[in-house]
Amino acid sequence: TPSQCTAAQANKCCTGLTNGILNLNVLPALNP
């Protein structure tokens, strides 16, 4: 159903944003 598709897209987007934030927080720590 469209609602499930929307939920899947939202989850994918949310995961991408979370990974992006984690990368922004982790990468500077890895680069002295």
From Swiss-Prot:
UniProt source species: Aspergillus flavus
Record-given protein name: Allergen Asp fl 1
Domain of life: Eukaryota
Keywords, comma-separated and alphabetical: Allergen, IgE-binding protein, IgG-binding protein
Gene Ontology molecular-function annotations: IgE binding; IgG binding
